[in-house]
Amino acid sequence: MVDFLIKNLSFSYPGSEKYALKNIDLTINSGEFIVISGKSGSGKSTLLRMLKPELSPKGALSGEILFFGKTRDSLSLYESAGNIGYILQNPEYQTVTHTVQTELSFGLENLGTEPDAMRLRIAEISAYFSLEKIMDKKVSELSGGQKQLLCLAGILAMHPKAVIFDEPTSQLDPMASEAFLQTVNKLCRENGITVIISEHRLENIIPLCDRLIVLDNGEIISDSHPKKLSPALFRDNDFINSSMPAPMRIFSQFSEITELPLTVSEGRTTLEKLLKDKAVEMPAPEAPNNKTKEYAVEAKGVWFSYDKKRYVLNDFSMKIPKGCFFAILGANAAGKTTAISLMSGLLPLKTGKINILGQDIKKYKSSELFGKTVAVLPQKCESLFSCNTLEEELITAVKSSGLSREEQKKRVEQTAELTEISGLLTRHPYDISGGEMQRAALALILLKKPQIIFMDEPTKGTDALFKKKYASIIKNLCDSGITVIAVSHDTEFCAEYSDRCAFIFDGRCITDTEPKRFFSENFFYTTASNKTAREFFPAAVTEREVTELCKKSLRS
């Protein structure tokens, strides 16, 4: 049975000559698990919103969308709400009530469900998701993973035929992300619910899906099972080559491999076959760099609580060298965001000491600290935007720079080009994709030219191609003496590009070392490349390192 049938669909946003979607022909069958991927701005979110009438964007539309044989526009609000679920990137935007129980009942109440039937459905879905112990909890007290699970449970209580997810794991740490995707897969396989997911983070989801659909500039360039991806795509398409799971990327470079592994387990088996009877060179681990450094930020003995019931930071201490890219990792609710909020001055320091560039943070005036010394790229970067167009935002950011109008305009143009948003300057900040907004927020921060930049999940919603550009920007900043401190769940990015990695657990910094040592000494919280190859190359933590060592072993 066909859930969605899309015929020759094209769409462009108001005022834009460029198609956001072009000539889309797509059939989505009942019970399929479909992943839609593509670089930022390729049309993923636009396509998903087209499948949900209430969220469909305004603009020039041609073609046809059918849901179970009915045209999309002929669906009543009741039919759409009850049959098509939609999970947003950020669960904060989807929860509307105060407690878990009222959140679960909200959708059912709007559908006019009878009280007895409602109680049964809530009891059933709570048991299925093991929510019984948090039913009376406030939604605001839940972790990111719990909130995302609650949003899903609330939708499933309405018994939909299809559920659409727009980058549902972008706010989650790697372990919470994997657990959430396994839950979604179980729902699809055991209950026949159609699942359509847009994702940049493909490591955990590729092995689960029936089809991988890749968009590029609004057009479908590939639609197949991941194992049937054309080798030519890996050679000719930079996005495919950069964004697939580590085992696929590693072994796509070896002509001896005829079927690419999707998982770490398959990757290990493939590696064993590839290196069978070969002399494997085990590189010696690098010695730690213990040189005395100047510190941009020093925190010592910091304690912090939001409600006086539980300390989020417990005797927290951290030293961040000047001019380095310093990555902070850890699970959701470990205290990472609180730590950088205190170290940047966004939260008031009550207990402990924090020095910024050698001076007590309490001695800084706000006008001296923010902008000139410290800038913060928050996780919810939409809070940085208040103008009607991106161009207005960027011009406002340089008005106080002391530059002439001509110089201001030149700096805005250069920064827009660097962050790849030149073609978006006439757009409203809220009309662009999550990845594009992340790039625009980075442009705002760069225009301020601070000495220390704090970033909270900077690669969230960012495609694999721009991550490389992002890393280059960060390296240039650090080479010029600027310190970049990033909270991140992106283990591959941190392993490849950071200078130091710290791990926060239960409000304390547990370790702080070079990325190679950090990830090679971890067993669970490490990269897929390391998990794939550690039996052969225990110190290799990036795709590049594993590939180079494999090639070296094959030549020996």
Residue ranges and their predicted role:
Residues 231-294, 525-556:
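ABC ATPase nucleotide-binding domains
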Residues 199-200, 488-489:
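H-loop/switch region of ABC-family ATPase nucleotide-binding domains
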Residues 116-134, 395, 406-424:
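Conserved ABC ATPase "signature" region
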Residues 60-71, 352-360, 370:
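Conserved ABC transporter NBD signature motif
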Residues 163-166, 453-456:
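Catalytic Walker B motif of ABC-type/P-loop ATPase nucleotide-binding domains
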Residues 138-142, 428-432, 436:
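Conserved ABC ATPase signature
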Residues 52, 344:
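Helix-to-loop junction immediately C-terminal to a conserved catalytic motif
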